[in-house]
Regions:
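Hydrophobic, lipid-facing positions within transmembrane beta-strands of outer-membrane proteins
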Residues: 62, 121-125, 216-220, 279-283, ...
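Transmembrane beta-strands of outer-membrane beta-barrel pores
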Residues: 70-74, 141-145, 240-246, 303-311, ...
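Extended serine/threonine-enriched, polar tracts that run as long, contiguous segments within proteins
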Residues: 276-358, 366-368
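Outer-membrane beta-barrel "beta-signal"
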Residues: 70, 394-408
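Extracellular/periplasm-exposed beta-strand and loop segments of Gram-negative cell-envelope proteins
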Residues: 77-85, 91-118, 145-214, 245-277, ...
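Outer-membrane beta-barrel biogenesis signature
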Residues: 23-65, 224
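Transmembrane beta-strands of outer-membrane beta-barrel proteins
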Residues: 62-66, 135-139, 234-240, 281-283, ...
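Outer-membrane beta-barrel strand-turn architecture
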Residues: 58, 131-133, 226-230, 289-293, ...
């Protein structure tokens, strides 16, 4: 009877006294970092509980992410004089020598004066699927909003200064070999007869130049875990990449007549477009470390060998709304092909506020080698347009990103 009593007391003590369970977190050890599900687990916020339709980041399933990016790239083109102040006495009416220049010849418009750098806002979206073993299939797309820089010159020189006769109130560019459609107004300079100052670009009133740039990138591939511990993981990535640099230079010229009137056929437009689409495989790796409760820091590096298809297009044409019977244009185009090495690097700080939600902010740099750039965007020979392009050894886009992702 005595033994039965002690046995009953022992059983009650085992059942009622608190003990450590397998699902309990012991003070001093990181929660949910045992890697038992095959992926890196950042501690989750369980107090309070948010009823969101998301899953755990370590579980298999679909995920999606969107972020804002703000990147900058330099505008690299050479120094080319577009226009000077004065005009050519094309008929020799004033100077007695056809083609002699009248005026100071002071530079009025040069491509080097365009803004060399600006930030481009944009977005990056990604969708993918995560498997139980930690491997991910993904597709992402980044688009930067087109950015512009412009510059202009008019008939008013700085402080109204210039030689007597007001020759510097006219702008001239050395365009030649153009058809009569681009003759411009019959009379635009006082004291000269009809077409004695010949051509829209000779003795013009206003000129404007503008450069536009944009960038797009797409990646499709997979990411696999390589090495994991309770506090960090190393992973590899591979796939295909598409990158696209688009640049367009535009130049508008307006030549008013002697009475200050502007007809559609008295204006001309020049356009130079450089489009570089690049395709190729990429290979990379990344490292993520747990630094604080719900926070981690990651670094990523990918290298790609891209095949660049560069399309070059340049065109002279009359202004808008020109009658069809006098409308004309001159076109130039060619393609170039080259190999462009590419290196992308990123550093991101991650925050995991609730299950299935990830927020990150970071910095990224996109480096390209052996791309083309406009050295002298304008070819002044209307009949044989030949702008100058050169190889740019190094091109850099860099800036910041911030976004959010969801696991389902």
């Amino acid at each position: 009877m005595r033994y039965r009593y002690f046995a009953g007391v022992l059983v009650a003590a085992v059942l009622l006294l608190p003990a450590q369970g397998l699902a309990q977190h012991v003070v001093g050890t990181p929660a949910l970092t045992d890697g038992s599900d095959g992926g890196f687990q950042v501690p989750l916020n369980t107090d309070p509980i948010y009823r969101l339709p998301t899953g755990r980041a370590g579980d298999s399933g679909f995920y999606t992410a969107a972020e804002f990016v703000m990147l900058t790239q330099t505008r690299d083109f050479g120094s080319q004089t577009i226009a000077v102040r004065g005009f050519f006495d094309s008929a020799g009416a004033l100077t007695g020598v056809p083609g002699l220049f009248v005026g100071s010849g002071t530079e009025a418009l040069n491509t080097r004066d365009l803004s060399r750098q600006s930030y481009q806002p944009g977005f990056n979206v990604e969708i993918g699927y995560r498997f139980d073993n930690g491997m991910r299939l993904f597709f992402n797309y980044m688009q930067l909003i087109e950015t512009h820089a412009s510059l202009g010159a008019t008939l008013v020189p700085p402080l109204f200064r210039g030689p007597s006769g007001l020759a510097d109130s006219f702008l001239t560019a050395p365009v030649f070999n153009f058809p009569p459609n681009f003759a411009g107004p019959a009379r635009k300079v006082a004291g000269f007869g009809d077409y004695q100052v010949y051509g829209i670009w000779n003795g013009a009133s206003t000129m404007d130049i503008r450069i536009a740039q944009r960038y797009q990138e797409m990646n499709a591939g997979y990411r696999i875990p390589l090495l994991e511990t309770d506090y960090s993981r190393i992973y590899g990535a591979a796939g295909g990449r598409f990158a696209w640099f688009f640049e367009r230079f535009q130049w508008w010229t307006a030549s008013y007549d002697l009475d200050g009137n502007l007809q559609p056929q008295f204006a001309a437009r020049y356009t130079n477009t450089l489009s570089q689409r690049m395709y190729g495989p990429f290979l990379g790796c990344g490292h993520e470390i747990f630094i604080l409760n719900q926070f981690s820091l990651s670094t990523d590096l990918t290298a790609a060998m891209l095949f660049d298809v560069a399309k070059i297009r340049a065109k002279y044409q009359l202004g808008d709304n020109v009658p069809a019977d006098i409308s004309t244009q001159s076109k130039f185009g060619r393609e170039e092909f080259r190999i462009v090495p590419n290196l992308n690097a990123a550093v991101n700080l991650w925050w995991y506020p609730v299950e299935g939600v990830q927020i990150r902010v970071g910095y990224q740099a996109l480096m390209f080698f052996n791309t083309l750039h406009m050295n002298e965007p304008v070819g002044f020979n209307y009949g044989n347009i030949d702008p100058s392009y050169k190889v740019k050894e190094f091109r850099l886009l860099h800036g910041f990103n911030a976004g959010i992702g969801f696991f389902f």
